């Protein structure tokens, strides 16, 4: 059996640019791409925390160290500057890979979209 699993996530990153007339895509700071194991032209899902929009596009490289998250083309209509988004990518994983310990790459950022931490799992949600 094969499963479609979360592969990569950049959590609560702020939109820094919206370029309506740029060729469609999402430019992401190269440091963030590498940390999250997302490659250029890979399909990504973007979930806007501020307005609930959910959409797909593809990743392109943004200037390394800049904190850039640029929504381009029609994606620019889905967010405003400063909106917090989650960027995710998925992979098809077989049972053997899962049993061998396959884990996702989760990246967390500060208020300037700089990496503040990473981990390989989402913690169990508990009632408080």
Swiss-Prot record:
Its EC number is 4.1.1.11. GO terms for molecular function: aspartate 1-decarboxylase activity. One of its GO terms (cellular component) is cytosol. The modification Pyruvic acid (Ser) is found at residue 25. The keyword Transferase does not apply. It catalyses: L-aspartate + H(+) = beta-alanine + CO2. Keywords: Autocatalytic cleavage, Cytoplasm, Decarboxylase, Lyase, Pantothenate biosynthesis, Pyruvate, Schiff base, Zymogen. Binds 1 pyruvoyl group covalently per subunit. Pathway: Cofactor biosynthesis; (R)-pantothenate biosynthesis; beta-alanine from L-aspartate: step 1/1. Is synthesized initially as an inactive proenzyme, which is activated by self-cleavage at a specific serine bond to produce a beta-subunit with a hydroxyl group at its C-terminus and an alpha-subunit with a pyruvoyl group at its N-terminus. The active site is at 25 (schiff-base intermediate with substrate), 58 (proton donor). Signal peptide: none annotated. InterPro entries: Asp_de-COase-like_dom_sf (IPR009010), Asp_decarbox (IPR003190). Substrate binds at residues 57, 73-75. It is found in: Cytoplasm. Its cofactor is pyruvate. Belongs to the PanD family. NCBIfam families: panD (TIGR00223). Heterooctamer of four alpha and four beta subunits. Catalyzes the pyruvoyl-dependent decarboxylation of aspartate to produce beta-alanine. This is Aspartate 1-decarboxylase. It comes from Paraburkholderia phytofirmans (strain DSM 17436 / LMG 22146 / PsJN). The lineage of its organism: Bacteria, Pseudomonadati, Pseudomonadota, Betaproteobacteria, Burkholderiales. The gene is panD.
């Amino acid at each position: 059996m094969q499963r479609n699993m979360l592969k990569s996530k950049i959590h609560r990153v702020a939109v820094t640019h919206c370029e309506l007339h740029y060729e469609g895509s999402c430019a992401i700071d190269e440091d963030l791409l590498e940390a999250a194991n997302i490659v250029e032209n890979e399909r990504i899902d973007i979930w806007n925390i501020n307005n609930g929009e959910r959409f797909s596009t593809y990743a392109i490289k943004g200037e390394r160290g800049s904190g850039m998250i640029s929504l381009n083309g029609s994606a620019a209509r889905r967010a405003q500057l400063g909106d917090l988004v989650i960027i995710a990518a998925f992979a098809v994983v077989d049972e053997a890979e899962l049993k061998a310990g396959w884990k996702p790459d989760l990246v967390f950022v500060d208020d300037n979209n700089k990496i503040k931490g990473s981990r390989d799992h989402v913690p169990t949600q508990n009632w408080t």
